[in-house]
Curated annotation (Swiss-Prot):
Classification via PANTHER family: INNER MEMBRANE PROTEIN YEBZ (PTHR34820:SF4)
Residues in the signal sequence: none
GO cellular component annotations of the record: plasma membrane
Function field: Exact function not known. Involved in copper resistance. Appears to be involved in copper uptake in conjunction with CopC.
Record membrane topology: Multi-pass membrane protein
InterPro entries xref list: CopC/D (IPR032694), CopD (IPR047689), Cu-R_CopD_dom (IPR008457)
Domain of life: Bacteria
Entry keyword annotation includes Metal-binding: no
Family per record: Belongs to the CopD family.
Major place of residence: membrane
Protein name per Swiss-Prot or TrEMBL: Copper resistance protein D
UniProt KW keywords: Cell inner membrane, Cell membrane, Copper, Membrane, Plasmid, Transmembrane, Transmembrane helix
Keyword Transit peptide tagged: no
Length: 311
């Protein structure tokens, strides 16, 4: 098992890059025209640039921790040559360089969301997608070879995109549901419209996560369940599935009950109670998503094959 610091850094990096990708994507499919301008609905300049800078710092910390763990070096003088080798001679190093370049460009593009909001969001979405995709090179797919490796990577990347879309949307809705936002009638109308607009996107996201999750499981473990039951990987995976099911339940509650109730309440001019109920539901769903990301970070450091062989 990896050390707690490595897991914590993986968790923070996964969360950061998913939020970055998902927020930019949300701005494109949910907001319209001038609503995309930074500060009109969401402060994209601060959110995107800040998240990109944080992602770069986390990537640097993760690289140092990974190199330290692999080399056993304890002093900087010993560690530096290993870092140079990691960056220049490994696929993980290449993916890290690509991620850092993408994040640097995102930080600049994020500053332009006031002048050219739509163009900037397109640029950030594309570049953050690249940055998010590089995380696949730190997962189980990196251990495969040939065509299996290609398809495992492809499945991982699509899975990351779908998860990022969901997490980013939850963060966006959490920001839109803040108390000072729901006091404004115009903001509440935008919230209701974006909730309705997310219904189709949310369905596609959940379906994609389910399909790619099953395919990933088959790549990593194979068509077996019994031998996995007594492993740490198996228990963590079960906890992840329980939480994911709870998230689907909350998303269904939002879609079929709470969102329509909010829209109906707006028509009657009294939407405070509906907004509060939706806020609590979204907060619970977001909390579950955070725990799921923590489990994903931990699962990525485990080898189920080794655990099953030791039984």
């Amino acid at each position: 098992m990896a050390d707690p610091l490595s897991i914590a850094l993986r968790f923070a990096l996964y969360t950061d890059l998913m939020v970055l990708f998902g927020l930019a994507l949300f701005g494109l499919y949910s907001l319209r025209g001038t609503e995309r301008q930074s500060g009109a609905v969401l402060n994209f300049k601060l959110l995107l640039t800040g998240t990109a800078v944080l992602g770069a710092l986390l990537s640097l910390a993760a690289l140092l921790q990974m190199t330290k763990a692999m080399s056993g070096a304890t002093e900087w003088e010993e560690l530096f040559p290993h870092i140079k080798m990691m960056l220049a001679e490994t696929e993980v190093g290449v993916s890290w360089n690509v991620r850092m370049a993408a994040l640097a460009m995102i930080a600049v593009a994020g500053l332009l969301t006031s002048r050219s909001p739509t163009g900037s969001l397109w640029v950030v979405t594309a570049l953050s997608g690249v940055a998010l995709a590089t995380l696949a090179w730190t997962g189980h797919g990196a251990m495969d070879e040939g065509s299996r490796r290609f398809w495992h990577f492809a499945t991982d990347i699509v899975h990351l995109f779908a998860a990022g879309g969901w997490v980013g949307a939850l963060v966006a809705f959490a920001l839109l549901l803040r108390a000072k936002k729901v006091d404004n009638h115009g903001s509440v109308k935008i919230l209701a419209r974006t909730l309705t607009g997310f219904e189709s996107a949310g369905g596609v996201i959940v379906a994609t996560i389910l399909v790619t999750g099953i395919v990933n499981y088959l790549f990593i473990v194979g068509p077996q369940l019994d031998s996995l039951a007594d492993t740490t990987y198996g228990w963590l995976l079960m906890a992840k599935l329980v939480l994911f099911t709870a998230m689907i339940g909350l998303a269904s509650l939002n879609r079929f009950r709470l969102s329509p109730h909010l829209e109906h309440s707006i028509g009657h001019g009294d939407y405070t109670g509906a907004a509060k109920a939706l806020r609590w539901s979204m907060a619970t769903e977001l909390a579950a998503a955070v725990v799921v990301l923590g489990l994903i970070a931990w699962l990525g450091t485990l080898s189920p094959e080794v655990e099953m062989a030791m039984q």
